[in-house]
Amino acid sequence: IEQVNAMSKRVLIPIADGSEDLEAVTLIDVLRRAEFDVVVASAEERRMLTCARGTRITADTMLLDVLAQDFDLIVLPGGMPGAKTLGELEPLAERVRQQARAGLDYAAICAAPAVALHRYGVLKGRQVTCYPGMSDNLTGTHFLDQPVVVDGNCITSQGPATALEFALTLVERLAGRGKRREVADAMLVPATN
């Protein structure tokens, strides 16, 4: 049985003003519970950010300062206008394209698959999901109306209610089913199988 050193896994979570509160906090929390090295990076010109519902988050660092670093996973929360801000940030777009080309995991939830990953050009021909009202934006993809969709190294999810399943899926991708179960059990998530 392969033993994965969770702390050796690095995750980048870019956030902006207007990122979706529950998605951002769920991703940060669950991935840190899995003992990953999670870097929360501001796409704005300051570290203190205000999410879509008013939750304030202080980023660990500035996004442009860490884009040259290696990450096992880059994951974008949704929410508007946060996802749009991430979608329009060309240095992030190029970094996610590099991640995709290298066969490393990249992920997004809610509006972010439609307004960021699709804009970056990393979803063509992929099976994906997003916030249902935005699926028309996903031209050139195979939209699936499912909570979480994994297609190779691309992982997408629908929205706030699917954020926990999405985060646990990302834990499993990076550290295996046992780590997913350990994190889920500690959070009192009922076992599904």
PLM feature segments, named:
Residues 8-15, 19, 30-42, 59-193:
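Active-site-adjacent pocket-lining segments in enzyme domains
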Residues 19-24, 48:
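Short N-terminal binding/cap micro-motifs at the start of the first secondary-structure element
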Residues 1-6:
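Short, Lys/Arg-enriched N-terminal segments with co-localized hydrophobic residues
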Residues 48-60:
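A cross-family phosphate/adenosyl-ligand binding-site feature
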Residues 25, 42-45:
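Short glycine/proline-centered loop/turn elements that form peptide/ligand docking sites
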